[in-house]
Amino acid sequence: LTSINPVTRKVLRRRLAKKTLPWLSAALPFVLLICVAAFSISFALHVEAQQKGKLSKPRQLDKGITWQRDPVTGELNLGPGLINGSEGEKSGEPRAGVIGSATVRLVPVTCSVLGGDSAVIKGLNSGNFRVYDDEVERPIQYFSAPSSDPARVAMVIDASPSVFPDSVQMRGAESALVDALAPNDEVAVVDFAAHTFLQVGFSSDRELLHRAIGRVDVRELLGDTGGSNIYEAVYLTARQLFSAPRGPQAIVLITDGEDSGLGLTTDPASAAPPAGPRGMSFDRLTFEDLARTLAAANIQVFAISTENRPKIMTAAWLAKHADATLVTPDARKLGIPPYTLYLAELVRRTGGQLYFLREAQSLSDTLRQIAQRVSAEYLLGFTPLPSTDSDAPHRGWHSLRIEVVGRTDATVVHQAAYYVPATR
């Protein structure tokens, strides 16, 4: 238009405006609608991302619960205060692990296969294994190879004042477990002192888990300095967080072992459920209740003690006593304090492993070792031996033995026995 005389240029501009203005007026609502939609989608995605990584307020797992022991079966149940973290817990009864179909009840057992150099052995199939229930071979009806199904690992961290001297080394190092597990493995974070708090439930969101671990050391600000209920925390974690296994299930317990709730001594009676008339001590948690629950649900415990290892408690000594209880009056004569004795017994019963923080290169290295072992575990399922008067399995404890055929250098590590809860 610059080469046209001013009068002509003015006329052309008027004509162009008359043609384009109606089109712009008609298109403007659609343009605004597109802009609003784009903004809404962007905002929704932003909110979803924020919610996905949102760290909720810690949930107190022991709030409002009551202990109720069945006077007929002797099994310990949780009262109506139970916060159900998984399906199938509404009855409040100790729940055995269930895999396979809904109509076939199988006993799950997790195992690690180690070579002569203690390295994990992968690549085995169901035909390589033999399972013995009370020394009777049972057919394997469920098999999950390492990494076939996601593992679930709950970190249960002692936040009581008694472990404060080791807190500098511990804090932050716990994240090594999260980073070492497979991306689809899920981790939960629980901490405890006198009370038990769920910092975050099972999640594969690594950033969220790191933030949950980072706030564990605020317990003193909450005023929870009235003791250290270690085994209650483990029990509540097992009951409220875990469900039927599809892959390995484990609890990583970091503590000094000095429980202030159960009154444990080297006398085996201190760990057993109360006998006799019902009274105040009848409806309470015992170490035996915890062992039953973990064995029934196929949950391993890997314990990291912040105390020194007793001189006699070498790896060879623990292996020698793998099939018999460690809780005997002789333990004190051997120089094993009760707080370490019961950690070792819990590990023995669940097929886990006991570590000592003060002899490890670092907590991070120990946690990475645990992650490697969990990631290389096999999950087997078999039908238990029926009782003589019904198709239901015998109630109580049953010995387990697993062999690997075709590998002379293989050692199988698994829980020594499984437990079938008694019912009316």
What would you call each of these model-derived segments?
Residues 1-27:
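N-terminal secretory signal peptides that target proteins for export/translocation
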Residues 45, 49-424:
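Scaffold/interface architecture of coatomer-like assemblies
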Residues 12, 16, 39-41, 46:
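Intrinsic disorder/low-complexity segments
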Residues 5-9, 40, 148, 246:
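Residue-level detector of transmembrane insertion/anchoring sites
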Residues 27-42:
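Bacterial N-terminal signal peptides
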